[in-house]
UniProtKB/Swiss-Prot annotation:
Class of the enzyme per the UniProt entry, highest EC level: oxidoreductase
Superkingdom as given in the UniProt entry: Bacteria
EC number in record: 1.8.1.2
MF annotations from Gene Ontology: 4 iron, 4 sulfur cluster binding; heme binding; metal ion binding; NADP binding; sulfite reductase (ferredoxin) activity; sulfite reductase (NADPH) activity
InterPro entries according to UniProt: CysI (IPR011786), NiRdtase/SiRdtase_haem-b_fer (IPR005117), Nit/Sulf_reduc_fer-like_dom_sf (IPR036136), NO2/SO3_Rdtase_4Fe4S_dom (IPR006067), NO2/SO3_Rdtase_4Fe4S_prot (IPR045169), NO2/SO3_Rdtase_4Fe4S_sf (IPR045854), NO2/SO3_Rdtase_FeS/sirohaem_BS (IPR006066)
Sites where the protein binds siroheme: 483
PANTHER family the UniProt entry points to: SULFITE REDUCTASE [NADPH] SUBUNIT BETA, SULFITE REDUCTASE [NADPH] SUBUNIT BETA-RELATED
Family: Belongs to the nitrite and sulfite reductase 4Fe-4S domain family.
Protein name stated in the entry: Sulfite reductase [NADPH] hemoprotein beta-component
Lineage: Bacteria, Pseudomonadati, Pseudomonadota, Gammaproteobacteria, Enterobacterales
Keywords linked to the UniProt accession: 4Fe-4S, Amino-acid biosynthesis, Cysteine biosynthesis, Heme, Iron, Iron-sulfur, Metal-binding, NADP, Oxidoreductase
Region forming the signal peptide: none
Catalytic activity: hydrogen sulfide + 3 NADP(+) + 3 H2O = sulfite + 3 NADPH + 4 H(+)
Length: 570
């Protein structure tokens, strides 16, 4: 302990079992290859259950039928979730056609799920289809490496820019950062792609033999949009432009939303500003942040292992100085930037190159053929004729990019006929949920299946109080891990038990303030009763342009969270 920082740089003590597992895994190989051939179980055993996460998969089961199968003396219906690595959410139409085919033919649920980390997931991959899915991805230039567990996960990049040139530059950096921080082990290629074992020894110069202490998330942000919710992420590069050209980044470190119910040592935290850096130092700084967290992060307690806790333990200035030392730079003062919103601009938007971009609202990001709304088939038909790319947004929507004027009518016709352009309220456009039941093993309450009817009720309240043309950033997450990013919403519901949620208020529209718990463990009717009263007050008492979250703070309904590490639970 020194006087410079509040706690030790390295936490001494017994390492978690996850650290043992990583060390003994032979650079993430484990016995996954052998386990694949075990037909006695539909799942992976022992360490492999966790090791497959480094390869982009989670083992799950259908919780709707878990009890029924137990009664029949059957093991749970194991199936894998696979998450693709897709920096910035950009996917070609050729790649889309391949994933559409796989989802339809080789998954239990037949759907493609767009996520709020700008990628897609397959749910319900049986063990026999696990190797084929990796080979299918590889055949179209994709992979699932490092999209889960203790790695730098899928790198986000603002997807609805006002200037296409700036987006192109920022997207290139998102890709470079993603590639630079990837694990170097050949385990992925050996196990899934049948590449030969090479005699050389594996090395992980950046991540190390035991990888990172915990998950690590990175973004590239183009103000004034904060669509990627930078404060939910460990490392954020905020684009600074001069005359429409990218010149450098402001770096913000240490955001994160995951908490544990009732555990006051856990907290959501907004990211801290470190300073400005010119473009040429980007990769060195990214590596320095990651290696500092690698060496200083807490490996004795996974609930205290994220970058946000390291920053609070050692102090922001100490961490920043170490990043400067490792990167061989001095940060310049933060350059001015501001955010004005987080939502996607649904519908047609003209780019600066005379091409058009069509943003399609996809409720909960779930792409499936619904009765009367064949979303999946519609997108496949568009993918067959569209010459540009698709872009997945951090709001779980899809952008068809680079549509020339001559193709606009054709694409719009397919989109309308497939239900991809059905009109929805501003409120629905600004609401989001994680997957939760039936596939997520951590789910405590419904989220994706709860949201549509819940928003019907909220729409009725908005109409009742004369604010139907307005919106409140509203999010539901099925457990406190926070994948639905409810802890950056104006109204956040965090699942507590079946049918029960903690209601959080006081975030803001631009995603720079953590909401505080207003009521604990309440039901949907209780939530709606509270919001009925509060939306009524907001409609009558708000100032010009004042969002719901800002109103709840100004009116004294909720105390703002100013320093989450210390006052979130007050």
């Amino acid at each position: 302990m020194s006087e410079k920082h509040p706690g030790p740089l390295v936490v001494e003590g017994k390492l978690t079992d996850a650290e043992r597992m990583k060390l003994e895994s032979n650079y993430l190989r484990g016995t996954i290859a052998e386990d694949l051939n075990d037909g006695l179980t539909g799942g992976f055993k022992g360490d492999n259950f966790l090791l497959i996460r480094f390869h982009g998969m989670y083992q799950q089961d259908d919780r709707d039928i878990r009890a029924e199968r137990a009664e029949q003396k059957l093991e749970p219906r194991h199936a894998m979730l696979l998450r693709c690595r897709l920096p910035g959410g950009v996917i070609t139409t050729k790649q889309w056609q391949a994933i559409d085919k796989f989802a339809g033919e080789n998954t239990i649920y037949g759907s493609i799920r767009l996520t709020n980390r700008q990628t897609f997931q397959f749910h319900g991959i049986l063990k026999k289809n696990v190797k084929p899915v990796h080979q299918m991805l590889h055949s179209v230039g994709l992979d699932a490496l490092a999209t889960a567990n203790d790695m730098n996960r899928n790198v986000l990049c603002t997807s609805n820019p006002y200037e296409s040139q700036l987006h192109a530059e920022a997207y290139e950096w998102a890709k470079k950062i993603s590639e630079h921080l990837l694990p170097r082990t050949r385990a992925y290629a050996e196990i899934w792609l049948d590449q030969e074992k090479v005699a050389t020894t594996d090395e992980e110069p950046i991540l190390g033999q035991t990888y990172l202490p915990r998950k690590f998330k990175t973004t590239v942000v183009i103000p004034p949009q904060n669509d990627i919710d930078l404060h939910a992420n460990d490392m954020n590069f905020v684009a600074i432009a001069e005359n429409g050209k990218l010149v450098g980044f402001n770096l913000l470190v240490g955001g994160g939303l995951s908490i544990e119910h009732g555990n006051k040592k856990t907290y959501a935290r907004t990211a801290s500003e470190f300073g400005y850096l010119p473009l040429e130092h980007t990769l060195a700084v990214a590596e320095a942040v990651v290696t500092t967290q690698r060496d200083w992060g807490n490996r004795t307690d996974r609930k205290n292992a994220k970058t946000k806790y390291t920053l609070e333990r050692v102090g922001v200035e100490t961490f920043k100085a170490e990043v400067e030392r490792r990167a061989g730079i001095k940060f310049e003062p933060i350059r001015p930037y501001e955010f004005t919103g987080r939502g996607d601009r649904i519908g047609w938007v003209k780019g600066i190159d005379d091409n058009w971009h069509l943003t399609l609202f996809i409720e909960n990001g779930r792409i499936l053929d619904y009765p009367g709304r064949p979303l999946k088939t519609g997108l496949l038909e568009i993918a067959k004729i569209h010459k540009g790319d698709f872009r997945i947004t951090a709001n779980q929507n899809l952008i068809i990019t680079g549509v020339p004027e001559s193709e606009k009518a054709k694409i719009e016709k397919i989109a309308k006929e497939s239900g991809l352009m059905n009109a929805v309220t501003p409120q629905r456009e600004n609401s989001m949920a994680c997957v939760s039941f039936p596939t997520c093993p951590l789910a405590m309450a419904e989220a994706e299946r709860f949201l549509p009817s819940f928003i019907d009720n909220i729409d009725n309240l908005m109409a009742k109080h004369g604010v139907s043309d307005e919106h409140i950033v509203m999010r539901v997450t099925g457990c406190p891990n926070g994948c639905g990013r409810a802890m950056l919403a104006e109204v956040g519901l965090v699942g507590k038990a079946p049918g029960r949620y903690n209601l959080h208020l006081g975030g803001n529209r631009i995603g720079t303030r953590i909401p505080r718990m207003y009521k604990e463990n309440i039901t949907e009717p209780e939530i709606l009763a509270s919001l009925d009263e509060l939306i009524g007050r907001w409609a009558k008492e708000r100032e010009a342009g004042e969002g719901f979250g800002d109103f709840t703070v100004r009116a004294g309904i909720i105390r703002p969270v100013l320093d989450p590490a210390r006052d979130l639970w007050d």
